[in-house]
From Swiss-Prot:
GTP binds at R476, I477, R478, V479, G480, D481, S482, M483, R579, D580, L581, Y582. The modification N6-acetyllysine is found at K468. It catalyses: L-glutaminyl-[protein] + L-lysyl-[protein] = [protein]-L-lysyl-N(6)-5-L-glutamyl-[protein] + NH4(+); L-glutaminyl-[protein] + serotonin = 5-serotonyl-L-glutamyl-[protein] + NH4(+); L-glutaminyl-[protein] + dopamine = 5-dopaminyl-L-glutamyl-[protein] + NH4(+); L-glutaminyl-[protein] + histamine = 5-histaminyl-L-glutamyl-[protein] + NH4(+). Gene3D superfamilies: Immunoglobulins, Transglutaminase-like. The lineage of its organism: Eukaryota, Metazoa, Chordata, Craniata, Vertebrata. Belongs to the transglutaminase superfamily. Transglutaminase family. Monomer. Interacts with phospholipase C; promoting alpha-1 adrenergic receptor signaling. Interacts with PLCD1. One of its GO terms (biological process) is cellular response to dopamine. The active site is at C277, H335, D358. One of its GO terms (cellular component) is mitochondrion. The gene is Tgm2. Transmembrane segments: none annotated. This is Protein-glutamine gamma-glutamyltransferase 2.
Amino acid sequence: MAEELLLERCDLEIQANGRDHHTADLCQEKLVLRRGQRFRLTLYFEGRGYEASVDSLTFGAVTGPDPSEEAGTKARFSLSDNVEEGSWSASVLDQQDNVLSLQLCTPANAPIGLYRLSLEASTGYQGSSFVLGHFILLYNAWCPADDVYLDSEEERREYVLTQQGFIYQGSVKFIKSVPWNFGQFEDGILDTCLMLLDMNPKFLKNRSRDCSRRSSPIYVGRVVSAMVNCNDDQGVLLGRWDNNYGDGISPMAWIGSVDILRRWKEHGCQQVKYGQCWVFAAVACTVLRCLGIPTRVVTNYNSAHDQNSNLLIEYFRNEFGELESNKSEMIWNFHCWVESWMTRPDLQPGYEGWQAIDPTPQEKSEGTYCCGPVSVRAIKEGDLSTKYDAPFVFAEVNADVVDWIRQEDGSVLKSINRSLVVGQKISTKSVGRDDREDITHTYKYPEGSPEEREVFTKANHLNKLAEKEETGVAMRIRVGDSMSMGNDFDVFAHIGNDTSETRECRLLLCARTVSYNGVLGPECGTEDINLTLDPYSENSIPLRILYEKYSGCLTESNLIKVRGLLIEPAANSYLLAERDLYLENPEIKIRVLGEPKQNRKLVAEVSLKNPLSDPLYDCIFTVEGAGLTKEQKSVEVSDPVPAGDLVKARVDLFPTDIGLHKLVVNFQCDKLKSVKGYRNVIIGPA
């Protein structure tokens, strides 16, 4: 009788498997695999080698606290002649004496998470069990049988592997790209993402069921949407929108997700202060990409927050056009969420592909502050019965806006406002380039098209179907040049009378600082004049906005809302026009000193010219970049920076990965907040 087969050790082939599974950056000390794909391991036996005629090898793979075959969290499989794609299986690749090389495969629908892999070796009546090691299983966008399969290699690299990108802010007329370090492969981030799944209330309530359901990216996307905010659980970020961030970090100051996720883990899963929509979206993007789900951050300009699902945002104003009160139903200057790519077997055919997921806590969905995933195609088609939260997302891009002017007797009159259209310039980063891609067409049919009317009819969007009133008088807000921080500048109310009648009007122009979510701040410029509009004439009325007026009340959004209200007393009519202005921050210049080689020290010199007429105090540069720095670095500049002078600092870098990387920089001081910059750095081999 053959002697017992004893295992000496197991080589999980971490580096080789990491290269094959596009997880090399994660495979420093642990094996990280993508499901549905073959991987290799090598067994070293003591005394004698494996003999197929007398030895039997059976493998076990388990995940979660209470694994079971029924839940899909436990598997037993024997060595076979060939690896079976799409199931737990193993076969021999090669044998040299006591060394056995094996090939194994996981199912394309296996739950993701941490697995323990074991081996039972039996010879006759003798048998021994061995723990071969642990591995982490992720979703696989390269596997056609996986629910997150994406058939474009360029898109897989952008939406799964790329660690830096852009988030779009500013205003619909001045779109601002903000660099962001997603850093999904940075040290400790994968463990933090798995911890996030284990902290979600569904896991704490029923651990076995939650682990089983992690096979579905739909389920995991919904969990991540809830866990990135902390409104119902021990989630990552606490939201705040009142411009008081003294006991935390301003949402505008963040430049990446890595620091946020590390803070959350290091402080015992306590909320990180503070986030706003793009921070929630960026952290969700990091987590979902890390878990293997193709994901991108999306910005919707003029985004509606409709609480009662009537697809209508109503503003009530006094006779001067001023809002009677700030309210929860608002038009946000912009709003960010993420889209993740997956199949939707729970929905009708055609609703697979990009799914909107919104982690910003706005409204509850099934009792939890989360939103989505909802098919972007379903939004475009106006199919509001689609899971999950289709009415809310449809309203974000399609709601109508009505302005009511309250009269002296308390009655209200409807004002005409052609300047505010919800759901414009929906933006995301282009694939493989540092450019913006407009994806509005994926959410909406062209304005005025028969398809648009059909969608509005299906969605019962009666207000959008109503005929628009025409008066023959039009007004829009135009801007001049030099809309930069520290400058005085002019804006103009451009008024056209396209009728044969003379119109006697009163124009009220007002500029106020505004937060990106539509909450107004103090006034920083006004004009009140009487106008005679001649037949078929055009007029342009300027409003001067002074730095001394806006400097003390501008929020970190750098936004000013200009409102024009044209009143025609004889006709008792009101015409409203608005425009949000974004004030450009000064440019951060970045120089890289030294030869950019792997594992060789580099120095980044960052500088900024003070554009203001006042000195700058408390200046600080913060930099980070996946593959360039292990952690975020900050440099304080103690001396005041006189008007027109440069503020400059140097930061040491130690690049560990070859290829293209982005160094992301933030600058803060007493008078300039959240100035962003970046530089692409190509690191060559040592």
